[in-house]
Amino acid sequence: PEYDEMRARGVTNHFSRVWIPDEPVESDEDFNKLMENIRAELDNAVKRVITCRPDYLVMGMSSETFWGGLQTSIELKKRIEDLSGLRVAMGSDACRAALACYGEIKRIAVLTPYWPVGDKNVRTFFTDCGFEVVRMKGLKCNGPVEIAYVTPTELVSAMKELDGTDID
């Protein structure tokens, strides 16, 4: 619903799911398997959605866009742009743009739904972008669907853990 709530008047959203099995994630190994499943299906999802001839492609999943750091993110974006023939926006782009709105901040805290292996890649990405990740908290969600079920109370609690005067 969030993407539909943000759409401009006259714009329609067309979705294509990256098909992955709804399997439990209980370890870094499981999280790596989830990432393999995403990679195996990402191109198919892009190919399906471009049949409606969209003007722009917004990727609503984030983990893959941070994986491997900034350079890998840039390469992924180029690959998806080449595959789709469209301009592409990704979660990693959105994070960089949002942080730029705050001026010259450098020291950040990051909250993710990921397991430690995912958090490591997010940290690498932000470090590559010139930020110092002072604190990070991964919620270790027990599966891709469970990310959507994190409660506002859980998020507020995690944000309080991350807060501090040592971050910008």
Predicted regions mapped to residue ranges:
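N-terminal glycine-rich anion-binding loop in soluble enzyme alpha/beta folds
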Residues: P1-N44, L111, P116-E154
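Short amphipathic alpha-helical segments and helix-helix/interface helices
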Residues: Y3-D4, V46, K77-I80, R123, ...
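Short, well-structured alpha-helical segments in soluble
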Residues: I38-C52, S157-D166
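Glycine/small-residue-rich loop that forms an oxyanion/phosphate-binding "nest" at active or ligand-binding sites
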Residues: V46-D93
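Periplasmic-binding protein-like
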Residues: D55-G60, A109-T112, I167-D168
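Positions that flank functional sites
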Residues: E64, R96, C141
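Hydrophobic, well-structured mid-protein blocks that either form specific transmembrane helices
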Residues: L76-G130
